[in-house]
Amino acid sequence: MSGAVFGEQMLGRDAFYALLAREGLKLKRPKPRHTTNSNHRFHKWKNLVKGYVPYGPNLLWVSDITYIQLASGNCCYLHLVTDAYSRKVIGWCLSHTLEAKYTIEALRMAIKQAEGADLSRLIHHSDRGVQYCCNAYVEELHNIGASISMTEDYKPTDNGIAERINGIIKTEKLYRQPLYGSFEEASIGIDEFIRFYNDRRPHMSIGFQTPSEVHRQCGPQQRQWQGYQQTSSP
């Protein structure tokens, strides 16, 4: 049928790719960017949040790191801490590298926004990356009395809320615009989007309220992500 429409000289897919390769026109496949290095000597903590649904803010924080491509071909890294109850981004840091000091900076922002609240019932959940397992990060969590929880394998659903926030930032902001021209431009743009996300963007999983609205509440919300099925008791 395609021959009848486009003519007998139409190339098939494989022949077309071979022609591109022969003429040097194929683009190089970009190297994958990895933000998680779980091959390290530090202790890896058990997953404490299977079936757990927080009933208020500052009971479950989820953390993750994602990368942002720049127009120069380089990238920068966005370290995020999100409250799982309200879906509010409560801590973030944009950095040139994956050093743990930037992950700690995002955590300290989250602690500061809690404004002295009792965090002794807080669970901090993340992947098993070295940034979250290193002594300095663990010490920050121990200092506030938080429990530490980590994913047990590499399934994105094990840190689903954090992965969802990454996806929202990329699909609703980064993929709809040209690449940022500089680190400084990226920092301004991310700051603006996080403010918009927290204060103005209704969220399906919290009854079309904004994260900032829900962060001032407690009690069950209308919808929850799959994987957090059981409400915690006060």
Q: Where do the PLM segments sit?
A:
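C-terminal domain-tail junction helix/linker
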Residues: 142-146, 168-234
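Short small-residue beta-strand/loop micro-motif enriched in glycine and branched aliphatics
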Residues: 88-92, 149-151, 175-177
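Active-site beta-loop-alpha junctions of metal-dependent nucleic acid enzymes
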Residues: 74, 92-117, 133
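Basic, flexible linker segments flanking DNA-binding modules
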Residues: 1-57, 155, 210-219
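Short helix-terminating capping/connector loops at secondary-structure junctions
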Residues: 9, 117-120
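Mobile genetic element proteins and their domesticated derivatives, centered on retroelements
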Residues: 16, 20, 49, 64, ...
